[in-house]
Amino acid sequence: APARFSQIFEEPLAEMVEMLQQRGFACALELGSEDVLLTVRAQYIRRILDNIGSNLIKYADPARPIEVRFLRQEGRAGLVFRNHVLPAPPAVESTKVGLTSIETMMDKMHADCKIEQENEQFAMTLLFPVE
């Protein structure tokens, strides 16, 4: 059943931010005021945010804030996560595992996952169909 964006993301996002803050990361959230209706699987959302959180802990530069922003695009809405990566991550392969499982879960929800990396800037966009 469709649920409001705030209902879906509030708790798992708060948990992710708390986990990051405990490890010395600063998070800047811009969630806007538009509360769209999305149909998602709550357990996937939790696991996706868990994965994103642990990726950030491994690869993000703690000296730079992690940005989480609400995004509305045509018939879709979701979140953009942006961070700076530390120079020369030890083993890039391990990020791929987390990213693949995120992409799989997003597929199952008919949602899109886009990953962009430019120099030390990393961005992941999650977009869900709006009801």
Positions of predicted regions on the chain:
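Conserved micro-motifs of the catalytic ATP-binding
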Residues: 1, 37-40, 111
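Short beta-strand/loop element within the Bergerat-fold HATPase_c
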Residues: 63-75
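A conserved beta-strand-to-alpha-helix junction within the catalytic ATP-binding
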Residues: 1-14
